[in-house]
Each structure stands twice: as C-alpha cells, then as structure tokens.
Amino acid sequence: MYKPKIICLLLGILSGLVFAPTFFIPALLTLSYLCYIVQKSENWQEATKFGYLFGFGHFLSGIYWISIGVSVYIADFWWAIPFALFGLPIVLACFISASCTLSFFAKNNKYYQFIFCLCWVLFEWVRSWIFTGLPWNLIGYAFSFSDILIQPLSIIGIYGLSFIVIYISTSAYPLFSKQFTQLKILLASSVLVLTIIVIYGAVRLSNNHTNFTDIKVRLVQPSIPQTEKWNEEEFWHNLMLHINLSENLEPTDLIIWSEAALVVPDDIPQVKSKLLKMLNSTNAILITGGISDNKKQGDEFELYSAMYALDKNNHKLFEYHKSHLVPFGEYMPLKKILPFKKLTHGLIDYKEGNGGLVYLEKYNLKIKPLICYESIFPDFVRTNNEIADVIINITNDAWYGKSSGPYQHFHISRSRAVENGLPMIRVANNGISAIVDPFGRTIKKLNLNEINGTQGLIPKKLISPTIFSQFGNFTILLLIVFILLINYLLALILDHQRV
C-alpha cells in the first residue's frame, strides 16, 4: 500500500495549488481520489493515514509562506523555520485525517460521498476555533478567483461554499471503482449545482451596480520591508513616506494607514506636529494602525495592537484594540512552559481587546474594524455587524514577501464583504490594498510591492442584510437538504430511464 500513500501525498501537494494566486482549479479533482481511497481502505487506521498524507501535502504547498515570515528575523528565529514549514502542516493535516477517519465508517452507506463532504466541512469548522483557530485556505476559497462564484457566500457563508466545492470536486470518485450509474448521478447533480451558482452569481451582479456614499477615502500603501519597519534609523523616513503618499492626491475625507503604521505613540511632540500638519493640509481624518497601552504601570501594564482615528484638532475619535491575536506572533501561548519570545517586535506580549464596532460621528459612519488576520474568521466578523456601514481591515503582509500569502489573505478578506453585504476598505503596509464593494467586486486596488496611494468613494452597504449575516451557518442545513433532493430526483430519473 505504499503506492497509494505516495499518491495521496503528491495529490495533496497538488491540491494546495487551488488557492490564490495560482487558482489551479483542475487540482480539485485530487479530492475524488482521496474520497475513493478512503472508501476502499481496509480499516479506519489505513483511511486515517491516507487522509493524513493528503492533508500534509495540502497544507505544505498551501501555507509554505508562513516560514518566510519566520525567516525575516532569521538570526533570532532560525530554529523556528522547520517548525513553520513542516510543523504547521503536520498539525493541520490532523483535521483532514480526522474527516477521512470519520468518513470511513460510512463507506458502505449509499450516501458515502455526501457524508465525506459533510465530514470535510465539519473539520474545517472545527479548525476555525480549536486552539484559537486557523480557518485559512478553507476549500471554498478555491472559487474566490471569480466574483460570480463567490456570490453564494451571501446565503450560505464560506462553510456552505466549501461544501459545494468539495461536493463537486469528489463527484468523479465512482470512476475509480467503475460505478458508472452513481457517476452519472453525481456528475449530473454537480453540473446542475454549478449551473445554479453561476446563474445566481451572474444575475446578482448584473442586477446590482455599486452604489457609493459621499465619503472619500484614501488608501496609503508604503510597502516598507519588514526589516526596516521597526528600525529606529528608518523611522522618520518611513513616517514621511506615509505622509507624502497621503498628501499627494486630491482632497479626501479619510486617510487610512496600515496595521502598526505608527510604531511609536502619536503624542510624541515631533510626531504629533507632523501628523497635525498633514491633517490640517488635507482637512482629513486619519485612521491608522498603531501601538496602544492602558497607561498603567508594573504588572497592570497592558499593550495592544490598535486602530484609531485622529482629526486635525488632535482629538482621538475612536480606538479599537485587536481582539483576535496571532499566537507566537503577537503573544506566546504557554509562556511558562515555552521559554521563547514572540515573533513581532518587543518583549511584551500584546493583550486582547474587546472587539465590537466603532463610530465616526462626523460622517455618521459605523465601522467594523479588523486588524490583520481577524478578517479570516467568518463568525467573528459576523458578530455585532448588523448596524455596521463598512469593514475597515488594516494589515501588514510585508512579512511574507512575494509569496502566496498576501494574495490568499486578500481573497479571504474580501469574502467577508460578500457574506455580510458590507463594503470593505483594506489597507496593507505591503500586500494588496483595495476598496471592495458589498458584492466582493474590487473598485480600487494597489498591488503587492506597489508604493503608492489610491482613493475613491466608500461604497454603500446593502439595503437589506444578507441571509448569512442574519442566520449564519444554519443556512448550510438548507443547502444539504437541497443537494440531497437533487440527488434523489436524479436517481429516480435514471431508474425510470432504465425501466
């Protein structure tokens, strides 16, 4: 059985290419082989091994770029590179392995393929919250290359779209065992489901043009290398680069800088002077990422990754503290056991904020703030967003260089706009900055490594909230019933034709 194991590993590596930026969609068919080999396994232990090898390859090629982030400070963290490159796939492979183990026990069920899809999505959901969660590269994001194909997110969310993708991708599995009747049913139902998605997405986009508010926003992307971002000698150069990019465009209402754009407190006199000069010359409000603390001393001192707004009168209009922190990056879990420092600058761990919305009174703008990878958590973004007008996502993807990471992050983030029917303003230090409408369409964009600013009007949110934003993942139950009904009807039709 070594040959199937090697095949599973290689196909897993190939399957990781279905995500941004390659979007090699034919690789989704690798899942048909996995579905087949799990069913043909002699015991659950063998099915577990097949799933694990596939999962290891899947995450190895899909999130290899995390090791690039670790290598930024290679002198201090050289030892962590193998853990980032191989250790994370070793852990994450357990979720695909577990889904295969569970599926094996339904190998003789006539709805085996359907159960396989359910198990896959179940463990994607588990992966989104266990051990703080990492719902990166859920299989549904393979469809994010197309504005049309991601429109179902407004109804069924990313887990529902994952179910559709995995269902279509495994529809060819009876081919390996020459079960041609079942193959006809699954292929026919997959074509029908895909056709419905395409029609729904195309009609939804063609019938809904982007409507805009009167609020002008400027996105500033300085693309500062991570090695220079916290360098004291580069501080004034970096600050002036932000300011020059902010001033060198038409008049605007809001200027948005990226995550931790201000690496020092904004009340330092020389810094404050330059910020106020910029804000007075542009007559704009600055929304920026920065570092904040609770103004206490000793053991009570707490440090936060923050997003806040400043006006030309030096008033802080709101302040948001990041509530979903990156383990090992922004804090060290099990710090009493693991004698290591966090990856990001500084010796002190960041503390969690409270999340929630912020309000910009001047423009009557209710904002759902998201810092960095908070945007990858669909349930977190959906929480308390029913009165929000816009999502503002600031990030710093300079860690990952010219790799798959920044592209994947962008497409994952814009999916939240479609799910919630909200426009998204996304600003990266380096990465992909964009204005995205509530249908996920990119209105303005700055590409990876581009040093520039761009601006436009903030799109309006949808008049009515999306079905997903109201009911969340419960809509997946309707999807399951719908696809089961399609399968049942197609089976009846084929039986009637044989008679």
UniProtKB/Swiss-Prot annotation:
Source superkingdom: Bacteria
GO molecular function: N-acyltransferase activity
Residue ranges constituting the CN hydrolase domain according to the UniProt record: 220-465
Sorted UniProt keywords: Acyltransferase, Cell inner membrane, Cell membrane, Membrane, Transferase, Transmembrane, Transmembrane helix
Top class in the EC scheme: transferase
Coiled-coil ranges (or none): none
Gene3D superfamilies per UniProt: Carbon-nitrogen hydrolase
Pathway: Protein modification; lipoprotein biosynthesis (N-acyl transfer)
InterPro entries in the cross-refs: Apolipo_AcylTrfase, C-N_Hydrolase, C-N_Hydrolase_sf, LNT_N
EC number assigned by the record: 2.3.1.269
Transmembrane segments: 6-26, 50-70, 77-97, 114-134, 148-168, 183-203, 474-494
Subcellular location: Cell inner membrane
Residues the record marks as active site: 259 (proton acceptor), 322, 372 (nucleophile)
Disulfide bond annotation, renumbered to this chain: none
PROSITE patterns (alphabetical): CN_HYDROLASE (PS50263)
HAMAP family membership: Lnt
Function text: Catalyzes the phospholipid dependent N-acylation of the N-terminal cysteine of apolipoprotein, the last step in lipoprotein maturation.
Name under which the protein is recorded: Apolipoprotein N-acyltransferase
Organism field: Rickettsia conorii (strain ATCC VR-613 / Malish 7)
Gene: lnt
